[in-house]
Swiss-Prot record:
Taxonomy, superkingdom: Bacteria
Protein name (Swiss-Prot/TrEMBL): Protein translocase subunit SecY
Similarity section: Belongs to the SecY/SEC61-alpha family.
UniProt xrefs under PROSITE patterns: SECY_1 (PS00755), SECY_2 (PS00756)
Function: The central subunit of the protein translocation channel SecYEG. Consists of two halves formed by TMs 1-5 and 6-10. These two domains form a lateral gate at the front which open onto the bilayer between TMs 2 and 7, and are clamped together by SecE at the back. The channel is closed by both a pore ring composed of hydrophobic SecY resides and a short helix (helix 2A) on the extracellular side of the membrane which forms a plug. The plug probably moves laterally to allow the channel to open. The ring and the pore may move independently.
GO CC entries: plasma membrane
SUPFAM superfamilies from the UniProt entry: Preprotein translocase SecY subunit (SSF103491)
Organism placement in taxonomy: Bacteria, Pseudomonadati, Pseudomonadota, Gammaproteobacteria, Enterobacterales
Gene label: secY
Length: 441
């Protein structure tokens, strides 16, 4: 009897989470496809020569893009552009939803408006991918040392390269949307996460090899590990931190009775902007070094070499520029992601209010005041997380994958993935309880 009950419970447990397993399998399958695609080269490029040449472009935006694409750029893969055009397109459309009347109306149309906005994101992604692939293909022969990388620099090569890069980016965008729909978590974030994590084993082995050869002291290696562990704990703590604003509801009269609803909370994350500010700030400080590595040997671009010298990680200008860019993008992207006035209007329409604060404009001002404080603290936290590993990487020659931006992305994506899995498990359990008790609505 006990054995049969146990078997029945195990069977029911397996049936409850069968869909979760299918979603997990779909994510794994999609990531395998992504990794396989990152090894498909663009026809007409000597991948061995390109990989050796990119070793001289360390500390530039090229290295960061190569990290996000899982090494696809160094292999001249069809996924070389990665998912960056989609990220840029999403931010452009988010800006338009704040300033353009047509996009403002679409945002208010609910599900139908969201589908139309997603279409515009796809169109702009296609345009950006076309521009970037054209620029990358045309500029390759003009970059010092890259002439020998292209086997036959003819018109047919440029056409094939441009089409391959555009197709690769559109495929990644489609794959990311499929992961979001049929898998677990945000598909685009998981693709970026997969690209970064794919380089961790080789970076770790390279660091261990330095310890074995004596170029990196064992104590320093242990110190680096402790710092990475502590920084990871800090990221987990901050990313889970929330400022909860107590929301009360007005009493309602139903028939001859008066009912008062329980109070709830409006949770505001300390770091609402996510990892986007770190990515764009890194792009800004690395962009001059990228241009200088391409055109610095020409006479009319010599001034770029001087700028790059002052934008080295130990220089005050680098630190100031990096911190300023992070703070700016934190406030900018938080303003795009969260609208205090819209939140205040929704609270007023639902009969909710904050104790001691008048509904409407006063509530919006109160929420905005809290958001400004949280965003400032969040930007300081992000600047610290991004700068400390970067300085360690410069002074201690730690591999690029241990940088602050990559660490932040890895931890944030894992936290979001675990949260969504937990939410899915809870919703499945609630559904099973309702079915068991035959509740109907």
């Amino acid at each position: 009897m006990i054995k049969k009950k146990l078997e029945t419970k195990l069977k029911n447990f397996g049936n409850q989470f069968s869909e979760l397993k299918q979603r997990m399998y779909f994510v794994i399958f999609s990531l395998i496809v992504f990794r396989m695609g990152s090894y498909i080269p663009i026809p007409g490029i000597d991948t061995v020569a390109l990989a050796s040449l990119l070793e001289h472009h360390r500390g530039t935006i090229i290295e960061m893009f190569n990290m996000f694409s899982g090494g696809a750029l160094s292999r001249a893969s069809i996924f070389a552009l990665g998912i960056m055009p989609f990220i840029s397109s999403s931010i452009i459309v988010q800006i338009l939803t704040l300033i353009h009347p047509k996009f403002i109306e679409m945002k208010k149309d609910g599900e139908q408006g969201r589908h139309r906005i997603n279409k515009y994101i796809r169109y702009i992604t296609l345009i950006l991918a076309a521009l970037q692939s054209f620029g990358m293909s045309i500029s390759l022969p003009n970059i010092p040392g890259l002439k020998d990388v292209i086997i036959d620099p003819s018109i047919s090569f440029y056409g094939i390269a441009i089409i391959s890069l555009i197709t690769g980016t559109i495929f990644l965008m489609w794959l990311g949307e499929l992961i979001t729909e049929k898998g677990i978590g945000n598909g685009i974030s998981i693709i970026i996460f997969s690209g970064i994590v794919s380089g961790l084993p080789s970076s770790f082995l390279n660091t261990v090899e330095k310890v074995r050869q004596g170029s990196l002291h064992v104590l320093l290696f242990c110190f680096i590990g402790i710092v990475i562990f502590l920084v990871t704990l800090l990221v987990v703590y901050i990313e889970r931190s929330q400022r909860k604003i107590t929301i009360s509801y007005a009493k309602r009269n139903l028939g001859h009775r008066t009912y008062s609803m329980n109070s709830t909370h409006l949770p505001l994350k300390l770091n609402m902007s996510g990892v986007i500010p770190a990515i764009f700030a890194s792009s800004i400080v690395l962009f001059p070094a990228t241009i200088a590595s391409w055109f610095g040997n020409r006479d009319h671009f010599k001034w770029l070499v001087d700028i790059v010298f002052y934008l080295q990680p130990t220089k005050p200008l680098y630190i100031l520029t990096y911190i300023t860019a992070i703070i700016f993008f934190c406030f900018f992207y938080t303003g795009l992601a969260f609208n205090p006035r819209e939140t205040a209007d929704n609270l007023k329409k639902s009969g909710a209010f904050i104790l001691g604060i008048r509904p409407g404009e006063k509530t919006a001002q109160y929420i905005n005041k809290i958001m400004l404080r949280l965003t400032f603290l969040g930007s300081m936290y992000m600047a610290f997380i991004c700068l400390v590993p970067e300085l360690m990487r410069f002074f201690m020659d730690v591999p690029f994958y241990f940088g602050g931006t990559s660490l932040l992305i890895i931890v944030v994506v894992i936290i979001d993935f675990i949260s969504q899995v937990q939410t899915y498990i809870m919703s499945t359990q609630y559904e099973s309880v309702l079915k068991k008790n035959k509740f109907r609505f």
